[in-house]
């Protein structure tokens, strides 16, 4: 049987395909831009007759139809590997929960600890001449997840970019049970957190001054990493490489400015390596069939040993809060879950262990609440219930618009002094009093 004949044999409508779902099932809903669309719509019609359904996914970028039914919590539970704004909203509605992970371990979770998946469904690129459906810009953990699925349903989207890789960037038709030709929606776009602010630019300048020619970059999402990317694109830096968890628009700008060659990378030379991507159409168009860009599973991109083997590795990520001990929360504010651990700790550790490498965790020194009250992001201790994403033992450079502090080798009082020095001036006196109370302040300190 040819691949085209097998394709026709497995072709179903979305309504036909979701009939396989039954109460009590564990479902997989892809990841990020591969979250199903037509299948989600079809399942929403059936969901009121189902109960005790568990669904795994993450970084949902548009409102899902299954969440629009009456009383979703009576029918299913959403289990998120990494939360976005919609999933935070669903927490309040009682059917969404975060699953704490080090993102790099996710393929191993499926292969070693998750017994099985009843039904996996996701959007993919059209089948190629060799019978493969490409995962688009989301290799991530999808190959490992499909290995555990009793039933694999792919939803073909003709707009899905075909993202080349080295391995585990797609699934062969022989491993697929049903094929649905979807409605071909445009690939969901993710903004970079708005235009860079003056604070973002100040932080970016401090970091860019620390980046040498030939460095290998990892950028997170948000205004500060975007500001760093814009500044790099306009700089005199050259021969930069990319080895990152998330590929964002800033990398496209840097590449088109001629700054990225990958010529000095110790591994995957001349290629930009990433686990998943989300951004604007500009990004998806750049990644499509681009042999310079290498889509790879997250246990490859985020492996600490692999990251540390790359010389001059520069990791740039965001934080929510930092306390005077150097503990970093990048995923919650108190008990309120904001995002997830992701791969930040892996890159913080890998960059530090790299020859010439540096990890930068960035944050604005303050934020203003809805009532107009300004608060310090550098705290005496993290808020009660806040999750420690990066421990004080792992923290490297912490950066605000007032400067950067290298935590390595510093005792408790030295850390307190260094962090107070980069806090907003309006909060420094109170932070000194808090440090004294915690017995991490010396009288000889300024």
UniProtKB/Swiss-Prot annotation:
What EC number is given for this enzyme?
2.8.3.-
Any remaining note in the record?
Answer: The fermentation acid butyrate is of special interest, as it has been shown to serve as the preferred energy source for the gut wall and also influences cell differentiation and apoptosis in the colon, and this seems to aid in protection against colon cancer and inflammatory bowel disease. Formation of butyrate via butyryl-CoA CoA-transferase is the only available route for butyrate synthesis in the majority of human gut isolates.
Its lineage reads:
Bacteria, Bacillati, Bacillota, Clostridia, Lachnospirales
Quote the function comment for this protein. Answer: Coenzyme A-transferase that converts butyryl-CoA to butyrate. Can also use proprionyl-CoA as substrate in vitro.
In the UniProt entry, which residues are flagged as the active site? 245 (5-glutamyl coenzyme a thioester intermediate)
GO biological process terms held by the UniProt record: acetate metabolic process; acetyl-CoA metabolic process; butyrate biosynthetic process
Q: Which SUPFAM superfamilies match?
A: NagB/RpiA/CoA transferase-like
Species the sequence originates in: Anaerostipes caccae (strain DSM 14662 / CCUG 47493 / JCM 13470 / NCIMB 13811 / L1-92)
Molecular function via GO? acetate CoA-transferase activity; propionate CoA-transferase activity
Show the NCBIfam families listed in the entry: butyr_acet_CoA
In this chain, CoA is annotated as bound at: 220-224, 320, 343, 370
- Name used for this protein in its record: Butyryl-CoA:acetate CoA-transferase
Q: Which family does it belong to?
A: Belongs to the acetyl-CoA hydrolase/transferase family. Butyryl-CoA CoA-transferase subfamily.
Q: What class of enzyme is it?
A: transferase
Alphabetized, the UniProt keywords read: Fatty acid metabolism, Lipid metabolism, Transferase
* Swiss-Prot/TrEMBL catalytic activity: butanoate + acetyl-CoA = butanoyl-CoA + acetate; propanoate + acetyl-CoA = propanoyl-CoA + acetate
Query: According to its UniProt record, in which pathway does this protein act?
Result: Lipid metabolism; butanoate metabolism
Record-linked InterPro entries: AcetylCoA_hyd_C (IPR026888), AcetylCoA_hyd_C_sf (IPR038460), ActCoA_hydro (IPR046433), ActCoA_hydro_N (IPR003702), Butryl-CoA_acetate_CoA_Tfrase (IPR023990), NagB/RpiA_transferase-like (IPR037171)
